Amino acid sequence: MSKQRVVVGMSGGVDSSVTAWLLKEQGYDVVGLFMKNWEDDDDSEYCSTRQDWIDVVSVADLIGIDVEAVNFAAEYKDRVFAEFLREYSAGRTPNPDVLCNAEIKFKAFLDHAMSLGAETIATGHYARVREIDGRFELLKARDHTKDQSYFLHRLNQAQLSKTLFPLGDIPKTKVREIAEQIGLPNAKKKDSTGICFIGERPFRDFLNRYLPTRPGPMKTTDGKTVGEHIGLAFYTFGQRKGIGLGGSKDGSGEPWFVAGKDIESNTLYVAQGHDHPWLLSRTLTAGNTSWVAGHAPEVGHACAAKTRYRQADAACTFGAAGANADPNALFSLHFADAQWAVTPGQSAVLYDGDVCLGGGIIEHAATAQPVTRQPQKAALLTAR
């Protein structure tokens, strides 16, 4: 009887390498696939694509699997990076990893894997998939400190039905131990923390290569001008570093934070103190939705949500975003406690315990001064 073929997305990192080894040990016919999705290889200081490929080949040789490379650079720039720039141009702060997973790792990659005769794909993400009566659920990883379901919430039933997450039940510390025990050449390689497929590099410098700077006034929440910003795209809600203000503008000594943007007047608003009212929200509206089950929760459903990665789950109530709004497409969340720096462009992801329900892109968060939190319109990719 032939073995079930699984194509593993291999990045050259420890997680995907251990994933491939575990599946080989479980008897699968494992093929490794290395995705190249960014062409800027000349920027060797920050882009380690060549070294990553070398690591993938070394790991494949050690564990005894075939491996190949595939170039999705065109798909990445069209489906992910173009949207990334559009959102920043509109003053929002997108999360490229969310879109990258939905459009590249679990769409372009999945399609290519199927063309290689795979029955399933696997990645080194920390999450779990559970099947109940032919329906699939996306669950948090057992190790909640490493859970990545937030980035995977846009996966649908078809994608989850063909996906394995072998690390979902394993603590990260154990994954490192396995890598060292079996002698993986990349066992001590640090985890990647840069933009999906682009790598680790000074973010402001990178963004400046693609978006023009448009300086404008920097004002306090009471309208006093305290400086000049270099362009709204280069700041995000809740940002503290890189504003260029000390802690003494009002004598309190508290740090300054980005608290709002007015796109029409090109004004950046700053507030002093972590818990300033402009930084706190109890209600948000989100659109561009994706639901794991194929439909939204019932209006009035009590659940939990994250408005940024690594945030603790926050109790909330799911609602429609208006009297005539379809909550499958546009929804609101009402939080029991005020949430800090809820940021347009980021994902609001809903949970029932460990079960990820899906979510949407934050459009608006109600604060003490809603004028700067009006929905910031951007041309969104319909494919997302």
Swiss-Prot record:
One family name in Pfam for this protein: tRNA_Me_trans_M
Main location: cytoplasm
Superkingdom classification of source: Bacteria
Known EC number: 2.8.1.13
Gene Ontology BP term (one): tRNA wobble position uridine thiolation
One MF term in the entry's GO annotations: ATP binding
Region span, Interaction with tRNA: 146-148, 308-309
InterPro entries per the UniProt record, alphabetical: MnmA-like, MnmA-like_C, MnmA-like_central, MnmA-like_central_sf, Rossmann-like_a/b/a_fold
Signal peptide boundaries: none
Principal EC category: transferase
Keywords: ATP-binding, Cytoplasm, Disulfide bond, Nucleotide-binding, RNA-binding, Transferase, tRNA processing, tRNA-binding
GO cellular component: cytoplasm
Binding site for ATP: G9, M10, S11, G12, G13, V14, D15, S16, M35, G124
The keyword RNA-binding is annotated on this UniProt entry: yes
Keyword field contains RNA-binding: yes
Region (Interaction with target base in tRNA): 95-97
Site keyed Interaction with tRNA: positions: H125, Q346
Catalytic activity line of the entry: S-sulfanyl-L-cysteinyl-[protein] + uridine(34) in tRNA + AH2 + ATP = 2-thiouridine(34) in tRNA + L-cysteinyl-[protein] + A + AMP + diphosphate + H(+)
Active site: C100, C196
HAMAP family on file: tRNA_thiouridyl_MnmA
Protein family according to the UniProt entry: Belongs to the MnmA/TRMU family.
Role description: Catalyzes the 2-thiolation of uridine at the wobble position (U34) of tRNA, leading to the formation of s(2)U34.
Annotated NCBIfam families: PRK00143.1, trmU
PANTHER family in the record: MITOCHONDRIAL TRNA-SPECIFIC 2-THIOURIDYLASE 1 (PTHR11933:SF5), TRNA 5-METHYLAMINOMETHYL-2-THIOURIDYLATE -METHYLTRANSFERASE (PTHR11933)
Name of protein: tRNA-specific 2-thiouridylase MnmA
Protein species of origin: Paraburkholderia phymatum (strain DSM 17167 / CIP 108236 / LMG 21445 / STM815)
Gene symbol of the encoding locus: mnmA
